Design a protein with these regions (language model features):
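Alpha/beta-hydrolase fold catalytic core
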Residues: 1-43, 64-67, 135, 172, ...
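Conserved HGGG/HGGXW glycine-rich cap/lid loop of the alpha/beta-hydrolase fold
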Residues: 26-82
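Active-site loop/turn elements of alpha/beta-hydrolase fold enzymes
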Residues: 74-77, 138, 263
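Flexible "cap/lid" loop of the alpha/beta hydrolase fold
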Residues: 121, 125-164
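Conserved alpha/beta-hydrolase catalytic His-Asp/Glu region
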Residues: 143-149, 164-226
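Conserved loop-alpha-helix segment in the C-terminal half of the alpha/beta-hydrolase fold
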Residues: 228-264, 270, 275
Length: 289
């Protein structure tokens, strides 16, 4: 799970709610701390089990360039209300949510991290046309390898549980292993408390359905390339989700800009925020030129 190193919001950043025709979405809204907001705004989409807080380390730096930056919780994540119907978490439905939020916030640039990249791609394939699309640590198709095995274990653990009991099973999962893993990874007490609150707030139906989406996603790179949206593929040199070779090849098929972030793994926004923010600002500025 993506783990922020700090929960302190940058200057100019506030928690808010984005109202759309498809519902309300919890958000962090960052504006330049000083100077005008003259550049195109950006919308950031988190990954599986993630949230808007995953972007705290880069929000201030991105906004400082002179643009509004909004990060959201997807439907069923943390502080955004979920759907009880599994169909509400199909990539197409989540993509439609993103389009609605992008329109409400007048976003020019769209970024999706990990699973959020698949969601952002779905929005573009359904007709949304941002000034640019960034796929951050996201791949062309289903999640492979060890991360896929983790999802299979999660699904096996929750399989057959009555809907009314799912929240309890998620809590067992958190207290049984995930909390210990977070502490072992070096998260301090306030961050561990946040991770606990976030995990237990996730809609269990969403957790299950999004996991299945990650395991079954089709390669739609060629369809995305046909949309001709300026695209940026950005990932850490030690990404342990989609192999870096897959992301490199996806970038080539998309004729996309590509940057590999030194010293980062699956969460460059947390592990190398300054380098990541610089790369994004450079790409977004070029897309607006």
């Amino acid at each position: 799970m993506s783990t922020p190193t700090s929960l302190e919001l940058p200057e100019g950043t506030r928690p808010t709610t984005v109202e759309t025709a498809r519902g309300s979405f919890a958000a962090l809204d960052a504006m330049p701390d000083a100077g005008p907001c003259e550049l195109g705004s950006a919308l950031l989409i988190p990954g599986y089990t993630g949230s808007k807080e995953d972007f705290i380390a880069i929000l201030g730096q991105l906004a400082a360039a002179g643009r509004r930056v909004v990060a959201i919780d997807l439907r069923g994540q943390y502080q955004t209300e979920g759907a009880d119907d599994p169909g509400g978490y199909d990539l197409a439905e989540l993509g439609a949510d993103v389009t609605a939020v992008a329109e409400a916030t007048e976003a020019s640039h769209l970024l999706g991290h990990s699973f959020g990249g698949l969601v952002a791609r779905a929005a573009v394939l359904d007709g949304y046309s941002p000034a640019s699309l960034t796929l951050l640590s996201s791949g062309p198709a289903a999640l492979p390898g060890a991360r896929a095995e983790e999802l299979h274990r999660l699904l096996n653990y929750l399989d057959g549980t009555p809907t009314a009991d799912l929240k309890g099973k998620v809590a067992e999962m958190w207290y049984g292993s995930m909390k210990r893993q977070a502490v072992k990874a070096g998260a301090d007490a306030p961050v561990v408390a946040f991770l606990e609150e976030r995990m237990l707030a996730n809609n269990p139906t969403g957790l299950i359905t999004m996991a299945n989406q990650l395991l079954k996603a089709e390669d739609r790179t060629d369809q995305l390339a046909a949309r001709s949206v300026p695209t940026f593929v950005l990932y850490g040199e030690d990404d342990n989700a989609w192999p870096t070779t897959e992301q490199r090849d996806m970038a080539a098929r998309l004729n996309a800009e590509r940057t590999c972030i030194p010293g980062a793994a699956h969460n460059p926004n947390v592990e190398a925020p300054a380098t990541t923010a610089h790369a994004l600002t450079k790409f977004w500025n070029a897309a607006e030129a």
